[in-house]
Amino acid sequence: MTLQTNQTEKFTLPDLGKIQLQNFYNFLTKIIYKELKAFPKIYDSEHNFEFKIYPEEFFLVEPILNERESIYKSITYSTELYVTAELNCIKNQTKQKQKVLLGHIPLITSNGSFIINGISRAVVSQILRSPGIYFGSQLDSNSKCIYTATIISESGSRLKLEIDDRKLIWARISKKRKVSAIVLLLSMGIKLSDITRSIEHPAILDNILKKKNVLSNQKDAILEIYKQLFSAGGDPNFSDNILSELQRTFFQQRCEIGLIGRSNLNKKLGLNIPDEEIFLLPEDILATINYLIKLSLGIGSLDDIDHLKNRRVKSISDFLSEQLKNALNKIENTIEQSIKNISKRKRILTPKSLINSGILLAFFKDFFGSHPLSQFLDQTNSLTELVHKRRISSLGPGGLTRRTASFHVRDIHPSHYGRICPIETSEGMNAGLVASLASNATINTMGFIESPFYQLNDSSLFDKPIFLSAREDENFRIALGNRLAIDQEIQEKQITPARYKQEFINTPWSLANLRSIFPWQYFSIGASLIPFLEHDDANRALMGSNMQRQAVPLLITERPIVGTGFEANIARDSGAPLISNIDGKIQYLDSEFIEILGVDKKTYKLKLSNYQRSNNNTCIHHRAIVQLNQWVRKGQILADGATTIRGELSLGRNILVAYMPWEGYNFEDAVLISDRLIYDDLYTSIHIQKYELEIKINHQGQDKITKDIPHIDKYFLRHLDENGLVTLGSWVEAGDVLIGKLSSQEREDSLKVPEGKLLQAIFGLQIGNSRDTSLKLPAGGEGRVIDIQWIFQDEGGIDSNNFVNVYVLQKRRIQVGDKIAGRHGNKGIVSQILSRHDMPYLQNGTSIDMVLSPLGVPSRMNVGQILECLLGFAGKFLNKNYRITPFDERYEREASRKLVLSELHKAKKLTGYPWLLEPENAGKSRLFDGRTGETFNQPVTVGSAYILKLIHQVDDKIHARSTGPYSLVTQQPVRGRSRGGGQRVGEMEVWALEGFGAAYILQEMLTVKSDHIHSRYDVLGAIVTGTTIKTPTTTPESFRLLARELRCLGIQINDIEIYHETLQKKEIEI
């Protein structure tokens, strides 16, 4: 998409998915070489053998399987890393040089995700405190203000310097221990005379040197730090071991600041130290001390830790670089061990035999499988996928935690504008900690977020945009308006809102240095899809942007009548449509392939996705939109995805809505819908479930796939073929066997089964050596079998298992209990489905599709839905689509309202329907009751709204249980739908029943229906025989558990019955 505001200005929106791809490209081209270059030469103990690699000769091999085949076969999509290695025998002066496989590296897909064991995963970028120096202030234990300087290393370790109210300067070694800053400087090798010369205020230094026992040489300083750091008692003697230990645990961890830290220190302290000097130097400490002294004297400024100039983004390349470094260290250790033992080996070693190629992939798989920021890719729809890859998180290793993060950290900062979206974030405990990049933001090589701006000067009014980080744009006046509002000759219009030094000001246009590019430059791609965004409360806009990510792809999608113009860009960059890579002519076309005859006379074959399952069980599907013999250009869309139409994002449907109460069925957030949505498949979605069966091979034998399953009704086996697999295309229902399987078991195990002992005792029979472990369709899984696949593992041997996957497709129509939502945070649950004849209808006889509550608008302040609804209504009659950019009010007061009313007026003139725009009730019209034919008392707001069906569906939520599993400890029903659990009668539920005096119901719920073991069996027998249910005489299991826990504390509880007549005691065991 391009925006052109005059003859010379043109700006193209960036590729929204390129951040991940560029970052991984940087890893492949630069970081791998850098880490291989750091790989040392390895010698044996006698220096007879030398092993080394040639980093400049590394290369990667193209994967054998493509992305789609890797998912289908449940393997990792990866490339092989080869490097030239050399083993020299120095004694014999012989050399062996070979190209060796160093290991496998997972590859990023064209969509910016990774495929690990057949599952798509996304790596979320992490935003952390940048390495460097930060000055702050805090109160000490005596409530006196002290100034601090925190130096953050590249690994995240911290070194803290502080100046107290007595003007003494300390270096904090740990939370509780500190040493004089002079001691730290002496330990770094600088002389006391040099320190005296470098301090700008000698009087403060004299104050420190007046103290007793001031150290004066490097060895004593190192011993002092060692004693404080390791709490060493006595007076340790200086040795090389102490020096190396201190070097490893203190100086290397806390003093390696890296390139970013060095740049940060140079800028803050005004130093000219080369960027290659990545370790902390004595000059840095001296400059820090001087700055602290100035702060104590009221000179200088403190740092804002939440400013984006002090935070950097840790991306894919940084994470993978760490794993590569660790893997190479392990490879180095294994080679070292092998070479050390070389004299004991009789066989001749080669470079290939020294390297274990499995180490590298093991490290990467461990990262992708266990790291909190390597996440299961959210594939509900194509927007969700793109947003997930553009997410940035403050959580994770080295970051914040959701429980300890303060409100200050979560809040919006002025430096976020144009870089991090102020609207889209998680709800709940992650609010403000997980955010989304703004639509035009990019991440530079140093990891800082940049935003584009236009320069405003006489020489080049509309030049190429410049990308600035938060540190660089701080001293510029950035105009937030644009020239359309400024060029008018009204004096008041010459003042424009601007951003300057973290403040929002009004400034003359002539004083502005930069201006923003797009109105939606400040928002994420999710928020950029909301039309009339400026008329919505920010909380509801947040919900709207989050709920668009939960919309399920529909069977029949539709473009929104009212959009923002951003839909096509998001659809294209999400990877959902199939795009041509060449110019050519469509030679062949069907539902599986498209063949293009290129201008070079070569044939290119492109495969379409056909009803494939996503990570969220939604459908990934392609529909060809080109025709046979059609000429196509490079970049042209050949096939639409499940959520695109003609390359434009389409997540929902435009339906006729009315804002009115209807018999209480749309009370609160309930929604009334017409049966037309069901019969015309307007909200029918496709869901694909995957059922997996493992075929084990162990010492007892191999599992057998067969149709002959004993003790199962033949009705449930009706879909199996002669091999025991379900037939493709079968309609299966709950309880049907999908794969028949018998697992072998030992004879002793079969006797442990109760019926085994019974059969043996009565008939002398022995039950079989196999048990039924068939794959059965669970409740609620009814559907059509669309695919069966076998997965054979490469490893042979006794414990290698194979898998069979069965894919079942469900077509779900909208029903009561499903969740629906608009784009403005207006969500609701379907409460009633009415016949279209009973629904209210317009004056031209058209029935309303959905009735929403009018009380959901004023209190929530999302008026954008009303403007969208009315403009969509006009577009429906005018057969027009609208693309509205936000903040149109800066051009003219009431611009949005005027646009809507003018379009309604055009629709009224075109159709001749006067009720489309009535002067006394603008935007409202009279509706008729479908049941009686009479008009309602009040005119009603009617329009066409874009409504989405969300993934929160009643089929996945509804659950019922009669009997099922019980918790072993409490003997109460387990929790959760997935485990077949039950409801728990808690404290408040007991109060509710007590309030109504329902004593018997309460007793049943707390005993026979819950955890009274013997009584619940008696109840079942009483129901079957029709006898009276006896009142339990003993205590339930939860009370017995309490008694046992009290016994652990030494408190004995006894239950004693005393008979009134004889006064005899009878003790009952609890």
From Swiss-Prot:
Keyword Ligase: no
Source organism, top-level taxon: Eukaryota
Example GO molecular function: DNA-directed RNA polymerase activity
Database matches in InterPro entries: DNA-dir_RNA_pol_bsu_ext_1_sf, DNA-dir_RNA_pol_su2, DNA-dir_RNAP_su2_dom, DNA-dir_RNAP_su2_hyb_sf, RNA_pol_bsu_bac, RNA_pol_bsu_CS, RNA_pol_bsu_protrusion, RNA_pol_Rpb2_2
Intracellular or extracellular location(s): Plastid, Chloroplast
Similarity section: Belongs to the RNA polymerase beta chain family.
Subunit structure: In plastids the minimal PEP RNA polymerase catalytic core is composed of four subunits: alpha, beta, beta', and beta''. When a (nuclear-encoded) sigma factor is associated with the core the holoenzyme is formed, which can initiate transcription.
The protein's name in its UniProt record: DNA-directed RNA polymerase subunit beta
Organism: Chaetosphaeridium globosum
Primary gene name: rpoB
